[in-house]
């Protein structure tokens, strides 16, 4: 994409500068829209944190700088025990459906497909998000909603549903009873691409080689990335959102292929647009051409959270990656504890895993995947039947003698 995206970004920044929330942020940073002449200049714009974004959204409509008379839909998203609104204008919804239609074509959908959506349709956005894009695409849509697996299974089979939109775990539950007409499965709401062997597990439940489409979105930005029928990773929807990957500590861009925090900017959004929004999600972006026509790709989706980074053996390490990795190993319950120590002046890493009925091959594969995905060599991996309650991360390097 390169500098060709710059005119679009500049126009969006000019619009964003008319919003009080962003104008005050940019004025404090000493940056004006006319200062953005290159993509390097764009990185001088201030980041937007989830805390400040949500704080503004929670204000009443009369004092909320993101609310205007052009807003036509208000969904909600949870924040702790509270909710905050998600605003859309008609133009926002139309563009969202338009860019999603391209990804549906890339997924191999046809207008003749009958689709069933099992996500919620009330306050939250997921169900309506899929309903709207599928209708705009021209497919047939059944709004099943969540739960009630017996009724969902019956409707899917009675009406020859060919496309299922579901959490992967719910899809496996339905498939265990038999879903012979499904040819494409859209998964979301749970880690998938980042979990070793999950796709194979799902296909095994269906009993055949169905197409599986994974997506990454967040309530404030839908869509962000989606895989295609070639399953080469999750492609950034780059005609909707501009994605950066930065060092979580310095905020500086990382090199292509390096891990970092995903930062998002809407290209056209009118209501509550994001400007350099720090997602807190750890990922890698690779630029590789795919037969579907897109290139900016998250090869494994989201692989962890950036707010818990530690430096170990000279490597930046995010412990939450361990939990994601363990989901790909059936012998592990998912509970773990990683302990950092110092021995003879160097870092020593112990990993305790709760699990049972494992083989030496299982352990060897786990060691390989951990080293490959985290770049950290664990000195000891100890598997126990029951892990005592306690923190998942224990850093004893500053409390123990060398």
Task: List each model region and its residues.
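Conserved beta-strand termini and adjacent loop/short-helix elements that scaffold enzyme active sites
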Residues: 144, 215-217, 246, 341, ...
């Amino acid at each position: 994409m390169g500098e060709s995206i710059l005119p679009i970004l500049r126009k969006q920044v000019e619009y964003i500068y008319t919003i009080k929330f962003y104008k005050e942020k940019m004025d404090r940073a000493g940056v004006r829209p006319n200062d953005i002449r290159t993509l390097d200049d764009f990185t001088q714009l201030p980041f937007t944190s989830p805390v400040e974004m949500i704080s503004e959204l929670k204000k009443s409509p009369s004092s909320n700088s993101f609310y205007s008379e052009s807003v036509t839909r208000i969904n909600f998203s949870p924040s702790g025990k509270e909710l905050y609104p998600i605003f859309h204008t008609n133009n926002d919804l139309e563009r969202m459906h338009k860019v999603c239609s391209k990804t549906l074509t890339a997924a191999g959908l046809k207008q003749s497909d009958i689709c069933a959506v099992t996500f919620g349709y009330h306050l939250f956005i997921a169900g309506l998000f899929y309903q709207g894009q599928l209708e705009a695409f021209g497919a047939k849509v059944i709004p099943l909603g969540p739960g009630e697996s017996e009724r969902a299974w019956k409707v899917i089979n009675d009406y020859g549903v060919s496309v299922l939109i579901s959490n992967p775990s719910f899809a496996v539950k339905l498939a265990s009873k038999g879903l012979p007409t499904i040819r494409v499965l859209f998964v979301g709401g749970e880690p998938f691409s980042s979990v070793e062997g999950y796709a194979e597990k799902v296909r095994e439940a269906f009993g055949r080689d169905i197409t599986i489409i994974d997506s990454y979105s967040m309530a404030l930005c839908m869509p962000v990335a989606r895989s295609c029928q070639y399953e080469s990773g999750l492609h950034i929807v780059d005609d909707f959102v501009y994605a950066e990957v930065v060092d979580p500590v310095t905020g500086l861009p990382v090199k292509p292929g390096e891990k970092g925090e995903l930062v998002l900017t809407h290209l056209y959004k009118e209501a509550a647009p994001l400007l350099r929004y720090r997602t807190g999600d750890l990922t890698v972006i690779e630029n590789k051409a795919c037969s579907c026509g897109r290139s900016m790709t998250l090869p494994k989706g989201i692989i962890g959270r950036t707010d818990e980074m530690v430096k170990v053996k000279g490597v930046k390490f995010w412990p939450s990656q361990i939990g994601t990795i363990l989901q790909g190993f059936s012998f592990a319950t998912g509970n773990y504890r990683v302990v950092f120590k110092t021995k003879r002046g160097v870092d020593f890493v112990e990993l305790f895993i709760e699990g049972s009925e494992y083989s030496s091959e299982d352990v060897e594969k786990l060691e390989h995947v951990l080293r490959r995905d985290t770049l950290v060599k664990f000195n000891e991996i100890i598997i126990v039947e029951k892990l005592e309650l306690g923190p998942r991360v224990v850093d004893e390097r500053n409390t123990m003698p060398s």
